Amino acid sequence: MVLDIIKKTLREYNLLNNGDSVLVGLSGGADSVCLTHALWSLKDEFDIKLYTAHINHGIRGEEAKRDELFAENFSKKLGIECFVLNADIPQIAKDTNVSEETAGRNVRYNFFNKLCEKYYINKVATAHNRNDNAETLLMNFMRGSTTNGLCGIPYVRGNIIRPILNVSRDEIEKYCSDNGLEYMTDSTNLTEDYTRNKIRHTLLPYIQKEFNTSFIKTVTENACLIKDDSDYLDGIAEDFYKQHIRNCAVNIEDLNKTDSAIKRRVLRLMLRDIYNGLNDISSTYVADILSLADKSSGRQINLPYGIVAKNEYGKIILEHKKEETQPFEVSINIGETVFISELDKKVTVSETDMRNKDGAVYLSCDKTDKIIVRNRRNGDKFQPMGMNGTKKLKEYFIDKKISKDKRNSVPIIEINGEIAAVGNRIDKRFAFKDKGIKIECDDN
């Protein structure tokens, strides 16, 4: 019966193709033993080549060594090559400032990826089952989650496949018993030190006993229905994203034309891009970012790992937090090139008797004039070309919608103590006539 369920899952979700090489994560527990044996039984029918991978996490001492030897021997009996990695997960977790669970997951999938690259393996099979799915759904619901989190564990994500996701733990243990398969028991799975184990050993049995004996089946089937709806909304959000998002920025006016369900998904897509994934990004951050749309320009919030979200002149922007440009002032003579470290740019001043449309700044200037390149100071004013009177630099930046964090990076050209240009905007008193200087500002 279990093999029939697995075969149906493999075909329904197109998890395998003829000729696939599959790496099975083999911990030695009942789930991974069942998965390994089932795929081994089906390898000729599906024309696949199998490998196994085992990680000794360095947490349970002799018990972990026992599991390692079991995984190697079990694989050998089936004629499957087994790869083993020994890792000090507690130390890695400490060094990288993450939980042991997160460190273990990172090490595990990094190991899988390296093996796939080295041995040209194109699929990785993990032993998540229906009970795992129910536990994940309850965990996500209790800690707060998006709709996607209530869809449960996916059958396939990238090259990761989960062939026994529709098989219950009871069915797995019966499969092992019927086929005479031994398996190892992780003692930490029998304790209640971790949230998932409390759900597994206390909450789920209580719900099944007091409310619904088929709760695991019910909740995972409901998750499939939620996923159908969620996939439809995700598609709409993806279309919006392609049309309206540029460099992790979205016009608030465009965003507000969509429904709240689409707004949240669009923001999660932006977070996915800037974080290169969504691990550890709470739905609370999505709500916080969305609230920026109702606030004034210039408001911002700090997100984890050095990311900032801000409302900037009608846009919500996500970007890596930048260090503020420090004050600088550099003297330069005609015919010289200077490097300004605060801008990481080279500035070149040359004499010229003609003006081109090449993006450079052209100013009237004599050879004896004192030229300085600096950034803004309090009280700065200038007389922009095409405008009447004097303009405060602060007002000019606001009019040009130059954000506060970028204003210190705008180069200001000063001649004989007067502002001659702000960026590419020339002061009319220094407008180029018959001859003068050409100023070029290039990346280093």
What are these regions (language model features)?
Residues 142, 208, 271-275:
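Hydrophobic/aromatic-lined pockets within catalytic cores
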Residues 186-190, 213-216, 279-280:
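Short, surface-exposed loop/turn segments at secondary-structure junctions
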Residues 206-218:
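Inter-helical turn/loop segments and adjacent helix faces that build the functional surface
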Residues 1-26, 30-205:
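Core alpha/beta nucleotide-donor-binding catalytic domains of modification enzymes
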Residues 3-9, 13-31, 49-51, 55, ...:
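AMP-forming adenylation/ATP pyrophosphatase catalytic core
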